[in-house]
C-alpha cells in the first residue's frame, strides 16, 4: 500500500469516526464536523501534496489515578494518525509482535490479557507450586525516554517505502520531550 492509497477520502472519513469516539462533545470535534466533508477533503489534499504538518501538542497534567503529564494531539492530527495506523502501520507491525502482546490490538483486549496471565499463572503453579514471585511495575516515563534515533533505525528496517518512512519519522519527531535527570 502506498501513501496515496492510505490517505484516501474514505479512509480519512473512517478515521474521523474512530477519532471522535467518546469526544463528540469536545469543541474542536464539533467545529470540525460543521464542515466535515470540506475539512476531510482539505486534509486529504494537504496530505497528498505533502503540505501536512503535525501541530503542537496540547500539554496538561492529570491526577487520577496517578499524576501523569499528557501531550494530546489536535483533533485533525488524531484523524491523520488513526488513518495511518489503521490502514498501514498496524497491519504491518501486527505480524511482528509476539502472540501475547495485547496492547492496542484488535481482538486482544483486557479479557485476552487476563486470560493469558491466568493461563501462565496456572501453568507456573502446576510446575512450581507457590515457589515464585510476581513482579508488578511501571517504567516511569517510558515513552518519553525512547531514543528517537534507535526507534527510527528500527523503522528503517520495517518501512521500506521512502514516503511512508519519512511520514513515520515525522510522527516520531513531532513530540519532543525534555527529560531532566537529577542525580543526588
Regions inferred by a protein language model and the residue ranges of each:
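Glycine-/proline-rich flexible loop or hinge segments
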Residues: 18-30, 60-71, 98-100
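Conserved polymerase palm-domain catalytic core
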Residues: 46, 120, 124-184
Amino acid at each position: 500500500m502506498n501513501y496515496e492509497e492510505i490517505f484516501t477520502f474514505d479512509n480519512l472519513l473512517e478515521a474521523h469516526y474512530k477519532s471522535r469516539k467518546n469526544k463528540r462533545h469536545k469543541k474542536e470535534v464539533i467545529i470540525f464536523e460543521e464542515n466535515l466533508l470540506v475539512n476531510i477533503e482539505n486534509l486529504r489534499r494537504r496530505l497528498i501534496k505533502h503540505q501536512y504538518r503535525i501541530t503542537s501538542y496540547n500539554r496538561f497534567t492529570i491526577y487520577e489515578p496517578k499524576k501523569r503529564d499528557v501531550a494530546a494531539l489536535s483533533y485533525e492530527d488524531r484523524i491523520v494518525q488513526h488513518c495511518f495506523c489503521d490502514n498501514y502501520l498496524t497491519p504491518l507491525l501486527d505480524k511482528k509482535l509476539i502472540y501475547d502482546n495485547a496492547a492496542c490490538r484488535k481482538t486482544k483486549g483486557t479479557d485476552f490479557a487476563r486470560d493469558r496471565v491466568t493461563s501462565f499463572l496456572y501453568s507456573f503453579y502446576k510446575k512450581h507450586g507457590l515457589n515464585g514471585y510476581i513482579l508488578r511495575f511501571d517504567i516511569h516515563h517510558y515513552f518519553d525516554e525512547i531514543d528517537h534515533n534507535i526507534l527510527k533505525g528500527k523503522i528503517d528496517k520495517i518501512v521500506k517505502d521512502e514516503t511512508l518512512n519519512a511520514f513515520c519519522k515525522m510522527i516520531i519527531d513531532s513530540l519532543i520531550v525534555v527529560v531532566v535527570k537529577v542525580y543526588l
